[in-house]
């Protein structure tokens, strides 16, 4: 079976993990954590990066940091992972879902302003497949209405929008280092990017169980105490060691994934030209990271038939999110603003093909040949 995904392995992970084990410190904020955070800050230009156990934890941390209260409204696309919404629902917020653009599956920036009320606190753009949302428009809306922007850049590590790294444009950005992402911290992991310097001190406190422990270890206070609400949002240094190996090889991983993505695009372009499928669209000003390669079929039946055909050929291809507004929790905790013109329809057409760092050329050729055979 050719899997849909396999965690990236570059070969130096075990060496760094053994080094972490020999250091005598495996908990959070060890040497490898500091290396990773500094690398991310310097590479992407964020004021402060804090490693977390997951992107889910980063989103929850953002909701705490922005002091989301019951009754507040948070705008986001319905076509996203449940964590995007859960983080704010946990604080009592109401989720306001907005339709997506069919070209990128990102939130339609032209529909956001109509969804803003006097209760709106946050806009959460989700950079689907590592392709940027229209951030200039979103940030202008946030400034006009005095709102915060939390970028769900779970899939966006190494992607840019008009030269700026995804996750560094909004007030807060959230990365994922889950094993399904381009870079992993040994299976699970995330990072919170604090781009508004006024939020840094409280972010450190919330991440450290509500204490000023970070200031204590920097020698800024003689003891640390309970200062605020918080939780334990630290990644273990053993996981950070795994992540460090991946970040050292980040450019190599990125180039390999982009090459695999382009192979698919070039091979399937004739099918798109013939109108049989649709291929991903990368808007001007966006540089993507080849997080995924998807095609769009005619409808859900067409997609199901192809999934079954590929499965019989020992190839795993998968659809993606069930739109949140149609789920029981989505109906309870949120509402869809305006018309669902594209979210549901486009989600039922989308199929993701195998794409991961260690995908062999022969296996990718097999996937392509099988697809071409199906459509012939």
Swiss-Prot record:
Q: Would the keyword Transferase be found if you checked this record's keyword annotation?
A: yes
Question: This protein's superkingdom?
Answer: Bacteria
Q: Does the keyword Transferase apply?
A: yes
The UniProt keywords, alphabetically, are: Pyridoxal phosphate, Transferase
* Needed cofactors: pyridoxal 5'-phosphate
E.C. number = 2.6.1.59
Thermal dependence = Optimum temperature is 37 degrees Celsius.
Q: Which reaction does it catalyse?
A: dTDP-4-amino-4,6-dideoxy-alpha-D-galactose + 2-oxoglutarate = dTDP-4-dehydro-6-deoxy-alpha-D-glucose + L-glutamate
Task: Specify the enzyme's EC class, one word.
Answer: transferase
Q: PTM N6-(pyridoxal phosphate)lysine: at which residues?
A: 181
Describe the pH dependence. Answer: Optimum pH is 7.5.
Q: Which GO terms describe its biological process?
A: enterobacterial common antigen biosynthetic process; polysaccharide biosynthetic process
Range of residues in the leader sequence: none
Gene inactivation phenotype reads: Mutants do not synthesize TDP-Fuc4NAc and enterobacterial common antigen (ECA).
Q: Which family does it belong to?
A: Belongs to the DegT/DnrJ/EryC1 family.
What does the protein in this record do? Catalyzes the synthesis of dTDP-4-amino-4,6-dideoxy-D-galactose (dTDP-Fuc4N) from dTDP-4-keto-6-deoxy-D-glucose (dTDP-D-Glc4O) and L-glutamate.
Name used for this protein in its record: dTDP-4-amino-4,6-dideoxygalactose transaminase
Q: Which organism is it from?
A: Escherichia coli (strain K12)
Gene encoding this chain?
A: wecE
């Amino acid at each position: 079976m050719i899997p849909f995904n396999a965690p990236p392995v570059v070969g130096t992970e075990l060496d760094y993990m053994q080094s972490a084990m020999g250091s005598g410190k495996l908990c959070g904020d060890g040497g490898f954590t500091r290396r990773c955070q500094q690398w991310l800050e310097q590479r992407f230009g964020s004021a402060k990066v804090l490693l977390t156990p997951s992107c889910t934890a980063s989103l929850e941390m953002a909701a705490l940091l922005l002091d989301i209260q019951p009754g507040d409204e948070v705008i986001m696309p319905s076509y996203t992972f449940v964590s995007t919404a859960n983080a704010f629902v946990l604080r009592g917020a109401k989720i306001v879902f907005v339709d997506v653009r069919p070209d990128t599956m990102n939130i339609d920036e032209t529909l956001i302003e109509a969804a803003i009320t006097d209760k709106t606190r946050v806009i959460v753009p989700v950079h689907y497949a590592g392709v940027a949302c229209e951030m200039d428009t979103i940030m202008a809306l946030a400034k006009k209405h005095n709102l915060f922007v939390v970028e769900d850049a779970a899939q966006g590590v190494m992607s840019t929008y008009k030269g700026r790294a995804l996750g560094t444009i909004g007030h807060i950005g959230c990365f994922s280092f889950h094993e399904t992402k381009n870079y992993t911290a040994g299976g699970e992991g995330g990072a919170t990017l604090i781009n508004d310097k006024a939020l840094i001190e409280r972010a450190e406190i919330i991440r450290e169980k509500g204490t000023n422990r970070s200031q204590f270890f920097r020698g800024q206070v003689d003891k640390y105490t309970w200062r605020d609400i918080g939780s334990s949002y630290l990644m273990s240094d053993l996981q950070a060691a795994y992540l460090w190996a991946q970040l050292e090889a980040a450019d190599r991983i990125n180039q390999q994934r982009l090459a695999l993505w382009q192979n698919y695009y070039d091979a399937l372009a004739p099918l798109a030209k013939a109108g049989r499928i649709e291929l991903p669209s990368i808007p001007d000003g966006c540089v993507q990271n080849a997080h995924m390669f998807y095609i769009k079929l005619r409808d859900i039946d067409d997609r199901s038939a192809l999934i079954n055909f590929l499965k019989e050929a020992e190839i795993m291809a998968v659809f993606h999110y069930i739109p949140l507004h149609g789920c029981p929790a989505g109906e309870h905790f949120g509402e869809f603003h305006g018309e669902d013109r594209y979210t549901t329809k486009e989600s039922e057409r989308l199929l993701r093909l195998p794409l991961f760092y260690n995908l062999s050329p022969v296996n990718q050729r097999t996937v392509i040949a099988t697809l071409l055979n199906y459509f012939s």
